Amino acid sequence: ALGSVKLSRDAEFQGIMPVRGKILNCLKADYERIFKSDIITDLIRVLGCGVEVQTKKTKDLSAFDLENLRWNKVIICTDADVDGYQIRTLILTMIYRLCPTLIQEGYVYIAESPLYEITCKDKTWFAYTDAEKTEIVKKLEGRKLSINRSKGLGENDPEMMWMTTMNPATRRLIKVMPEDMERTMQVFDLLLGDNLQGRKDHIAENGYKYLDQLDVS
């Protein structure tokens, strides 16, 4: 994924920091384990703002100072599949645990990458959800179409990545909103904390809503 993303960025103002695989669940881990993770400490150093924790186990990471943040947006970009969503959640959890002010002050965003590329003659549409794909196909009913599904960033060529994910004029960003921090804490704890029974109950009560998103391959 790094190759296509790096080739599609504008190096004048966009920096790319790869995260290889799933990072540590920072909600369940103690600080000693968190700051032994090179992936996490490297990410914090790239951000430049330090961490908001009171512990001597932060290695050489500085105390949090928003003025030292090197970027005006922190954008999480992952594959458009269940593994990508989990990685996205783990990165959000890391920021929430170590640098919550970034969320509170509105610096954190999620980049949406398209699920489908739909081509009709010499024109191309991008669909970010199955519902969008259905709507586009319906509008083009009767015409010869080519529909390609893309689940991984590495499968997208740089031109497509620039148009859909990197170009500020055409990309889609979801701003992570801090409107209710108490509710945010409850959700993070439910999904990633130690409350196993609560998580089971939540899945039992709400799992049916997401059956179409299950990856059973």
Give residue ranges: language-model regions.
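Conserved phosphate-chemistry cores used by DNA topoisomerases
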Residues: 1-217
